[in-house]
């Protein structure tokens, strides 16, 4: 009855003495399975202790899978699982008939008399199932590596294998059950106490922007934040500013609290790492990007540039500019970075360039898979994830260009999965394209409006699951792609 041999060439080991191939046996413990099932049939309450981590597919024997599954179904209905109730459910099953099921169930009951701690048997069954899955993954990795198809690169195969192994390793960690309320209460009080000690009341990672921190209270672990805007609004520039500020602020906090330095991860699916770092250098050294690209720099500017370059090089700031990554690849690389570099916050530019895994022809379904995947990364790694997003062209057709939640591309699922949705909007961009002719009566009115929004970027917090929404005006220097706190100013109509 037991499946104790693998009849294929992939699982054959050589006997070193006789040089005779010996079929390898998959790891299993049929007796442990029998004794556990018998114990549960004797006392159904034992099921609650093992069902938190043990599923029917963890059993090696197909008949044991069916018996365990039947026990779960019977008890879910509020009935008692006994050999009699099981027999009525499985009587038409061919495998049950083949092994003379009634006698077999009686045998299980007899074997249960020797069980001392059934939970230990459940753990043995679970551990052996993990080992069998590990063998399956190993075979899959070998078979994929033998596949010489040019459609799948070796790098993709490695990431696929790494993801499979990580999922297998973390499977037991994700089997969460009810937690007594005292534990999360203690965690909440600890968080509140930390907030009370902070004069700025920022309990997450500071954005480096006072008014934005007052609205968001910093970036919080396990949150998914969406930063959306139309082209030329400054999405990437703003994300770079936030990433650099977060990197510096995490470092200071880690040093103060005597903790391991956390790092920033930045997936740049659109721009190359060179383009991204050129923007960083322009922002920090306050040298326009045209001068940097053309190399037209005086000695003073060049020295300033070298100084900022040296400072930036020391930061725990990591960029991955691989194009068209799948959500699975992003998850794998983020996990690796968390493990190797203590990832503290993750930025992704931008959401619509990520590929789904299921290859759905429905783009809304694919975006749903991606946003759910990003939220899962935030929760699993316990970090904030900030993903940039495009907005629908419908914005340009309205008189009022301020974005709304309904303007998100494939909006329903993005809005639903995000903890915070922010829009970046610069009225200056639109006004400069509506300048009346010089001498026109409306020119003075236009100039007055432009003065009031000059160098201002509005960050519109449209959704905030745990806080207020509203508008946060910031200073924006388009020459250096630099954001800062906005000083309160008065404007003259002259």
Curated annotation (Swiss-Prot):
Residue numbers binding ATP: 229-236
GO CC aspect terms: cytosol; primosome complex
InterPro entries on file: DNA_heli_DnaB-like_N_sf, DNA_helicase_DnaB, DNA_helicase_DnaB-like_C, DNA_helicase_DnaB-like_N, DNA_helicase_N/primase_C, P-loop_NTPase
A GO biological process held by the record: DNA replication, synthesis of primer
Domain of life per record: Bacteria
Entry annotated with the keyword Phosphoprotein: no
Domain SF4 helicase: 198-490
Keywords: ATP-binding, DNA replication, DNA-binding, Helicase, Hydrolase, Isomerase, Nucleotide-binding, Primosome
Hydrolase listed as a keyword: yes
Root EC class: isomerase
EC number(s) on file: 5.6.2.3
Chemical reaction(s) catalysed: Couples ATP hydrolysis with the unwinding of duplex DNA at the replication fork by translocating in the 5'-3' direction. This creates two antiparallel DNA single strands (ssDNA). The leading ssDNA polymer is the template for DNA polymerase III holoenzyme which synthesizes a continuous strand; ATP + H2O = ADP + phosphate + H(+)
PROSITE patterns: SF4_HELICASE
Example GO molecular function: ATP binding
Homology family: Belongs to the helicase family. DnaB subfamily.
Function as written in the Swiss-Prot or TrEMBL entry: The main replicative DNA helicase, it participates in initiation and elongation during chromosome replication. Travels ahead of the DNA replisome, separating dsDNA into templates for DNA synthesis. A processive ATP-dependent 5'-3' DNA helicase it has DNA-dependent ATPase activity.
UniProt cross-references to NCBIfam families, sorted A to Z: DnaB (TIGR00665), PRK09165.1 (NF006606)
Record's subunit section: Homohexamer.
PANTHER family attached to this UniProt entry: REPLICATIVE DNA HELICASE (PTHR30153:SF2), REPLICATIVE DNA HELICASE DNAB (PTHR30153)
Protein name: Replicative DNA helicase DnaB
Organism of origin: Rickettsia felis (strain ATCC VR-1525 / URRWXCal2)
């Amino acid at each position: 009855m037991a499946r104790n041999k693998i009849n294929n060439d992939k699982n054959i080991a050589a006997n070193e003495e006789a040089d005779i191939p010996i079929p390898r046996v998959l790891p299993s413990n049929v007796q442990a399975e029998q004794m556990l099932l018998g114990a549960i049939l004797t006392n159904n309450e034992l099921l609650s202790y093992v069902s938190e981590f043990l599923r029917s597919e963890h059993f090696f024997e197909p008949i044991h899978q069916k018996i365990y599954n039947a026990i779960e179904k019977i008890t879910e209905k509020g009935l008692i699982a006994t050999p009699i109730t099981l027999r009525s459910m499985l009587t038409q099953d061919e495998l049950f008939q083949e092994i003379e099921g009634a006698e077999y169930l009686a045998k299980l009951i007899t074997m249960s008399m020797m069980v001392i701690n059934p939970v230990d048997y459940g753990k043995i069954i679970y551990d052996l199932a993990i080992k069998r899955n590990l063998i399956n993954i190993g075979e899959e990795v070998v078979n994929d590596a033998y596949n010489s198809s040019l459609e799948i690169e070796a790098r993709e195969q490695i990431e696929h294998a790494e993801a499979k192994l990580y999922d297998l390793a973390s499977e037991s960690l994700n089997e969460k059950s009810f937690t007594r309320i005292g534990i999360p209460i203690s965690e909440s009080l600890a968080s509140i106490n930390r907030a009370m000690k902070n004069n700025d009341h920022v309990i997450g990672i500071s954005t480096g922007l006072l008014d934005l921190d007052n609205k968001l209270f910093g970036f919080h672990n396990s949150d998914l934040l969406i930063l959306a805007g139309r082209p030329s609004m400054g999405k990437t520039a703003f994300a770079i500013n936030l990433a650099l500020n977060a990197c510096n602020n995490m470092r200071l906090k880690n040093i103060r609290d005597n903790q391991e330095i956390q790092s920033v991860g930045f997936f740049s699916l659109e721009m190359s790492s060179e383009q991204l770092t050129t923007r960083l250098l322009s922002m920090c050294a306050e040298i326009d990007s045209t001068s940097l690209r053309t190399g037209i720099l005086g000695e003073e500017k060049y020295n300033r540039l070298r100084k900022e370059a040296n400072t930036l090089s020391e930061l725990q700031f990591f960029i991955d500019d691989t194009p068209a990554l799948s959500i699975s690849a992003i998850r794998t690389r983020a996990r690796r970075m968390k493990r190797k570099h203590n990832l503290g916050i993750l930025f992704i530019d931008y959401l619509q360039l990520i590929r789904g895994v299921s290859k759905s022809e429905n783009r809304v379904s694919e975006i749903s898979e991606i946003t759910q995947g990003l939220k899962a990364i935030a929760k699993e790694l316990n970090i904030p994830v900030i993903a940039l997003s495009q907005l629908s062209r419908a914005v340009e057709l309205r008189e009022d260009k301020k974005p709304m939640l309904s303007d998100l591309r494939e909006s329903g699922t993005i809005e639903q999965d995000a903890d915070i949705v922010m829009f970046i909007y610069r009225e200056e961009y639109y006004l400069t394209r509506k300048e009346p002719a010089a001498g026109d009566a409306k020119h003075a009115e236009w100039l007055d409006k432009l003065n009031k929004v000059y160098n201002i970027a509005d960050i519109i917090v449209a959704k905030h699951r745990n806080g207020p929404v509203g508008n946060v005006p910031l200073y924006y220097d388009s020459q250096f792609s630099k954001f800062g706190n906005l000083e309160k100013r008065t404007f003259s109509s002259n």
